[in-house]
Regions:
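An amphipathic alpha-helical interaction segment
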Residues: 1-17, 41
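Residues within the alpha-helical elements of helix-turn-helix
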Residues: 34, 82-83, 98
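Proline-centered helix-kink/hinge sites
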Residues: 54, 102-103
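Terminal helix-turn-helix DNA-binding modules in bacterial transcription factors
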Residues: 16, 20, 25-29, 47-92, ...
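Helix-turn-helix
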Residues: 31-39, 43
Length: 114
Protein backbone atom coordinates (compact mmCIF):
# COMPACT_ATOMS: atom_id res chain seq x y z
CA UNK A 1 0.00 0.00 0.00
CA UNK A 2 1.20 3.53 -0.67
CA UNK A 3 2.27 5.70 2.25
CA UNK A 4 -0.31 8.18 3.55
CA UNK A 5 1.53 11.03 1.78
CA UNK A 6 1.44 9.21 -1.59
CA UNK A 7 -2.32 8.58 -1.53
CA UNK A 8 -4.84 10.59 -3.52
CA UNK A 9 -5.72 13.67 -1.41
CA UNK A 10 -9.34 12.58 -0.75
CA UNK A 11 -8.21 9.12 0.39
CA UNK A 12 -5.44 10.64 2.51
CA UNK A 13 -7.94 12.98 4.20
CA UNK A 14 -10.28 10.07 4.91
CA UNK A 15 -7.57 7.77 6.30
CA UNK A 16 -6.28 10.57 8.54
CA UNK A 17 -9.85 11.29 9.69
CA UNK A 18 -10.43 7.61 10.49
CA UNK A 19 -7.17 7.42 12.47
CA UNK A 20 -8.23 10.46 14.50
CA UNK A 21 -11.85 9.42 15.04
CA UNK A 22 -11.79 5.61 15.32
CA UNK A 23 -13.45 5.71 18.76
CA UNK A 24 -16.51 7.49 17.32
CA UNK A 25 -19.40 6.45 15.12
CA UNK A 26 -18.28 7.46 11.62
CA UNK A 27 -20.70 7.65 8.69
CA UNK A 28 -20.03 7.47 4.97
CA UNK A 29 -21.69 10.89 4.64
CA UNK A 30 -19.17 12.32 7.12
CA UNK A 31 -16.27 10.76 5.21
CA UNK A 32 -17.63 12.08 1.91
CA UNK A 33 -17.67 15.59 3.40
CA UNK A 34 -14.07 15.15 4.61
CA UNK A 35 -13.05 13.99 1.11
CA UNK A 36 -15.11 16.70 -0.65
CA UNK A 37 -16.70 13.99 -2.82
CA UNK A 38 -20.06 12.30 -3.06
CA UNK A 39 -20.23 9.11 -1.03
CA UNK A 40 -20.46 6.76 -4.02
CA UNK A 41 -17.38 8.22 -5.73
CA UNK A 42 -15.51 8.13 -2.43
CA UNK A 43 -16.46 4.51 -1.83
CA UNK A 44 -15.21 3.53 -5.31
CA UNK A 45 -11.96 5.53 -5.03
CA UNK A 46 -11.19 4.42 -1.48
CA UNK A 47 -11.88 0.75 -2.18
CA UNK A 48 -9.81 0.87 -5.38
CA UNK A 49 -6.91 2.58 -3.58
CA UNK A 50 -6.94 0.65 -0.29
CA UNK A 51 -8.41 -2.67 -1.39
CA UNK A 52 -11.04 -2.49 1.36
CA UNK A 53 -14.02 -0.27 2.15
CA UNK A 54 -13.68 2.72 4.50
CA UNK A 55 -15.68 0.83 7.14
CA UNK A 56 -13.37 -2.20 6.96
CA UNK A 57 -10.39 0.18 7.15
CA UNK A 58 -11.92 1.72 10.30
CA UNK A 59 -12.45 -1.71 11.85
CA UNK A 60 -8.84 -2.62 11.05
CA UNK A 61 -7.67 0.48 12.95
CA UNK A 62 -9.95 -0.46 15.84
CA UNK A 63 -8.62 -4.03 15.98
CA UNK A 64 -5.03 -2.76 16.01
CA UNK A 65 -5.81 -0.45 18.94
CA UNK A 66 -7.73 -3.25 20.69
CA UNK A 67 -4.72 -5.57 20.44
CA UNK A 68 -2.57 -2.91 22.14
CA UNK A 69 -5.12 -2.47 24.96
CA UNK A 70 -5.67 -6.21 25.48
CA UNK A 71 -1.89 -6.66 25.73
CA UNK A 72 -2.06 -4.17 28.64
CA UNK A 73 -4.48 -6.57 30.42
CA UNK A 74 -7.63 -4.48 30.01
CA UNK A 75 -10.99 -6.26 30.05
CA UNK A 76 -12.49 -7.06 26.61
CA UNK A 77 -15.72 -5.16 27.42
CA UNK A 78 -13.71 -2.06 28.32
CA UNK A 79 -11.57 -2.42 25.19
CA UNK A 80 -14.69 -2.69 22.99
CA UNK A 81 -15.93 0.66 24.31
CA UNK A 82 -12.52 2.33 24.12
CA UNK A 83 -12.04 1.36 20.48
CA UNK A 84 -15.43 2.44 19.17
CA UNK A 85 -17.20 -0.89 18.73
CA UNK A 86 -20.94 -0.60 19.27
CA UNK A 87 -21.02 -3.55 21.68
CA UNK A 88 -18.83 -6.32 23.06
CA UNK A 89 -20.57 -9.01 21.00
CA UNK A 90 -19.74 -7.31 17.69
CA UNK A 91 -16.20 -6.63 18.92
CA UNK A 92 -15.61 -10.23 20.01
CA UNK A 93 -17.03 -11.69 16.79
CA UNK A 94 -15.00 -9.39 14.54
CA UNK A 95 -11.83 -9.76 16.63
CA UNK A 96 -12.02 -13.55 16.37
CA UNK A 97 -12.72 -13.34 12.62
CA UNK A 98 -9.63 -11.16 12.05
CA UNK A 99 -7.18 -12.47 14.68
CA UNK A 100 -8.33 -16.08 15.06
CA UNK A 101 -8.64 -15.82 18.84
CA UNK A 102 -11.27 -14.33 21.12
CA UNK A 103 -10.27 -11.06 22.83
CA UNK A 104 -9.98 -12.96 26.13
CA UNK A 105 -7.69 -15.60 24.60
CA UNK A 106 -5.54 -12.87 23.04
CA UNK A 107 -5.35 -11.01 26.37
CA UNK A 108 -4.31 -14.18 28.20
CA UNK A 109 -1.24 -14.53 25.95
CA UNK A 110 0.14 -11.37 27.55
CA UNK A 111 -0.71 -12.15 31.17
CA UNK A 112 2.35 -12.56 33.34
CA UNK A 113 2.68 -16.16 34.47
CA UNK A 114 2.43 -16.34 38.25
Amino acid sequence: KPSIEAKAPPVRRVTEHLLGHYTEKVTLEELAAVACMNKYSLLRLFTKTEGITPYRYLETIRIGKAKELLAQDLEPAEVALMTGFSDQSHFSKFFKEVIGLTPGQYRNIFKVKQ
